[in-house]
């Protein structure tokens, strides 16, 4: 039995155990720009409308992040880029990223997290500080997800 049939929801429902199909209904996936570049067309492997998180790893340029978000959005996916607080230097940078994701990729959702770096690059140290800035509200973002690691994150 094939466990992970991503191509279309109807194909998955017909060829997989119903319990597995129910379990996978509404799944999401995460990519990084460098790994997304290895996939010719995500529509060949994921159902349209799948939520795709775009991981922002320290050292990845915002241009690469926005380009990946734009591509995924144009292919019909619900893009949710990471906003790692410790990589974002100040409110101006946060507002620039938000504007670029919205303007260039049509993004309305975000995953807000502290980020995998030990020392903040600037003013922000936590996801709460990004939320409290009000930048996402002012921009009209529709959904904000928050990730946390109360036990610590070794990334």
Task: Describe the predicted segments one by one.
Residues 3-155:
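Active-site beta->alpha loop and helix N-cap motifs at the rims of alpha/beta catalytic domains
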């Amino acid at each position: 039995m094939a466990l992970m049939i991503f191509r279309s929801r109807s194909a998955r429902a017909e060829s997989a155990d119903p319990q597995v199909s129910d379990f996978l209904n509404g799944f999401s996936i995460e990519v990084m720009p460098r790994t997304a570049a290895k996939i010719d067309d995500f529509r060949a492997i994921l159902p349209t409308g799948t939520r795709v998180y775009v991981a922002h790893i320290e050292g990845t340029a915002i241009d690469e992040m926005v380009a990946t978000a734009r591509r995924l959005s144009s292919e019909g996916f619900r893009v949710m880029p990471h906003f790692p607080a410790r990589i974002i230097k100040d409110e101006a940078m946060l507002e620039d990223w938000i504007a670029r994701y919205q303007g260039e990729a049509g993004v309305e959702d975000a995953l807000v997290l502290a980020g995998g770096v030990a020392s903040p690059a600037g003013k922000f140290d936590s996801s709460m500080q990004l939320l409290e800035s009000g930048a996402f509200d002012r921009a009209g973002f529709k959904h904000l997800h928050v990730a946390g690691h109360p036990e610590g994150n070794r990334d």
